[in-house]
């Protein structure tokens, strides 16, 4: 729904430069659709003891908070058109995001699309986040629908894996990450 990835690329380039490890924006592709704990793990694997994890997190959120204090969340083209269509035809709509609840709700409100959603599921609301299917299964349960009757729009590998494993019909939304031939055949 949102192009938050481009903001994180800038943030992690800034953080990496400040901490002396060099631009780290490339890590966004490696962590797309993953919750904070998995993202931290990926950073540990990549950089080991080269930087303080708490400092990376603090600086990242400082950069992100400053960005959003001065800019609206970037909305992907066509989002409101799709949401208007779905609501106009009385579809029930859920968000299933790996991001924390406070971040998701702030972005939905900032983009003035919070009113479209019947259910909001976030990475900090489930025991296992994407690529595990839990978030989609829980969203479908709250919508009172079997996952086989739900469509999932995804732009990350971990999100696609989660949606497919849950039994949702899955639609790939091209973004920074591009699926390989095996993943393309599944969606």
Give short role names for the model-derived ranges.
Residues 7, 31-35, 59, 74-78, ...:
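Short beta->alpha linker loops
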Residues 14-19, 81-91:
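A short, Lys/Arg-enriched amphipathic alpha-helix followed by its capping loop at the start of a domain
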Residues 84-87, 100-187:
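Asp-based, Mg2+/Mn2+-dependent phosphohydrolase catalytic module
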Residues 8-29:
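Conserved phosphoryl-transfer catalytic core
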Residues 22-27, 42-81, 89:
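Metal-dependent phosphoesterase signature
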Residues 1-6:
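Asp-based phosphoryl-transfer active-site loop
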């Amino acid at each position: 729904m949102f192009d938050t990835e481009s903001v994180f690329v800038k943030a992690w380039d800034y953080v990496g430069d400040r901490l002396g490890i060099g631009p780290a924006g490339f890590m966004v592709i490696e962590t797309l659709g993953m919750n904070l704990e998995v993202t931290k793990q990926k950073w540990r694997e990549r950089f080991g003891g080269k930087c303080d994890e708490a400092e990376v997190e603090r600086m990242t959120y400082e950069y992100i908070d400053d960005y959003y204090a001065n800019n609206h969340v970037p909305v992907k083209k066509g989002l409101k058109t799709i949401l208007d269509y779905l609501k106009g035809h009385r579809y029930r709509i859920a968000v299933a995001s790996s991001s924390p609840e406070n971040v998701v709700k702030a972005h939905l409100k900032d983009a003035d699309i919070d009113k479209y959603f019947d259910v909001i599921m976030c990475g900090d609301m489930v025991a296992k986040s994407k690529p595990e299917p839990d978030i989609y299964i829980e969203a479908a349960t709250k919508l009172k629908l079997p996952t086989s009757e739900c469509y999932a729009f995804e732009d990350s590998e971990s999100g696609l894996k989660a949606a497919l494993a849950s039994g949702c019909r899955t639609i790939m939304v091209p973004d920074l990450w591009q699926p390989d031939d095996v993943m393309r055949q599944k969606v």
